[in-house]
Amino acid sequence: MARIRVPRKGVTQAELADVLSRRLGGGYQVEPDGDGRVVVRRSPLAAAVVRIRDVPGATVFRVHGGGLPLYRIGTTRRVTDALRRSPEFRSV
């Protein structure tokens, strides 16, 4: 599990899904699941689940892998890198 803290407060599922879709490109299917999570799929065997949590002065994303272990590691790593490098979450 990766934990990414960004200094921007109040990030929504829709914003997160939009940013991940742009950053990851067309090879990934990004969908909010309506339960405070966004699911990123590369194939039926590889997925990453991003949970959104608001904390004072920031938003925390927790990224978990889903699917077969060999495949989920790469997907989770790409999602984590995309979140860490996204300037959209750096400030309001």
Where are these regions (language model features)?
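Terminal, regulation- and interaction-focused segments at domain boundaries
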Residues: M1-G27
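A general secondary-structure boundary signal
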Residues: M1-R3, D35-R37, G57-T59, H64, ...
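Short beta-strand element of the conserved SAM-dependent methyltransferase core
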Residues: A2-P7, V39-R41, V49-I52
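Short beta-strand-to-loop capping motifs
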Residues: R5-V11, R42, V63-G65
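Hydrophobic, Leu/Ile/Phe/Ala-enriched alpha-helical segments that form helix-helix packing faces
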Residues: L20-Y28, L83-R90
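Amphipathic, interaction-prone secondary-structure segments
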Residues: G27-V49
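Beta-strand/loop substructures that line and gate deep hydrophobic ligand-binding cavities in soluble
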Residues: P44-R77
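A conserved amphipathic terminal alpha-helix motif
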Residues: L68-V92
